[in-house]
């Protein structure tokens, strides 16, 4: 059972993976489409990021079948991409030091010298 929304997302995921773009999953519909895409092309799984596991029982089953573990579990079942939005914000927060901190060279820290 499914609709054109799942078919459309499946095609979108296949295209995103073909272009080397990450795919952030959110909820049962997006995970169902992801599973369909993985069944068509197993390499798609390498591009999937499970933002959260919703309260819907099917969510955990789909993530298990995809071999993915969500990094955010907050008991959410709001819909409309809220889990993915929260997940992306958390990823941005985690990447901020990597992207914004200067290197040792940029701040004049000398290279490590072993003690003798």
Task: Describe the residue ranges of each PLM region.
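N-terminal loops that bind phosphate or other acidic moieties
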Residues: 1-116
């Amino acid at each position: 059972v499914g609709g054109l929304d799942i078919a459309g997302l499946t095609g979108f995921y296949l295209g995103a993976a073909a272009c080397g773009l990450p795919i952030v999953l959110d909820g049962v519909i997006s995970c169902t489409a992801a599973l369909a895409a993985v069944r068509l092309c197993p390499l798609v799984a390498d591009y999937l990021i499970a933002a959260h596991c919703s309260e819907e029982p099917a969510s955990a089953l789909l993530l298990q079948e995809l071999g993915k573990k969500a990094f955010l579990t907050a008991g959410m079942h709001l819909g409309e991409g809220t889990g993915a939005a929260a997940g992306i914000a958390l990823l941005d927060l985690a990447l901020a030091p990597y992207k914004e901190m200067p290197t040792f060279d940029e701040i004049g820290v000398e290279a490590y010298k072993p003690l003798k």
